């Protein structure tokens, strides 16, 4: 469960390392984001010569959460950290690689480009 002011790790090679959630998109009463939701983030730390700089505001897709998600077969999948992938204005990822594994629930939510860039799909 991701809410405003949550610090998240970035799981792609866009140049950002840490981001902070400043808005959860999806309506007026949508206050908590889960796996596969799009949020607005502010870049808190980045590497030099990256595609994004510290202080920039952009959208991000949540690909891993500590809270986890329950699948239809009853299994539960959790991760060790809260991670996102940065998106541009068209909804495509900034980076060309995604580090770590992503759940297959992202394919159902129409993010097949991100699933194809990932190292492993759970």
From Swiss-Prot:
User: Which key words tag this protein in UniProt?
Assistant: Ribonucleoprotein, Ribosomal protein, RNA-binding, rRNA-binding
Q: Per the record, GO CC terms? A: cytosolic large ribosomal subunit
Q: Which domain of life is it from?
A: Bacteria
> Biological process GO annotation list?
translation
Keyword Ribonucleoprotein listed: yes
Matching entries from CDD domains are given as: Ribosomal_uL14
| Keyword Cell inner membrane attached | no
Report a single Gene Ontology molecular function.
large ribosomal subunit rRNA binding
Partners and quaternary state? Answer: Part of the 50S ribosomal subunit. Forms a cluster with proteins L3 and L19. In the 70S ribosome, L14 and L19 interact and together make contacts with the 16S rRNA in bridges B5 and B8.
Assigned protein family: Belongs to the universal ribosomal protein uL14 family.
What is the documented function of this protein?
A: Binds to 23S rRNA. Forms part of two intersubunit bridges in the 70S ribosome.
Supply the NCBIfam families for this chain. rplN_bact
Q: What is this protein called?
A: Large ribosomal subunit protein uL14
Which source organism does the UniProt entry give?
A: Orientia tsutsugamushi (strain Boryong) (Rickettsia tsutsugamushi)
Q: What is the lineage of its organism?
A: Bacteria, Pseudomonadati, Pseudomonadota, Alphaproteobacteria, Rickettsiales
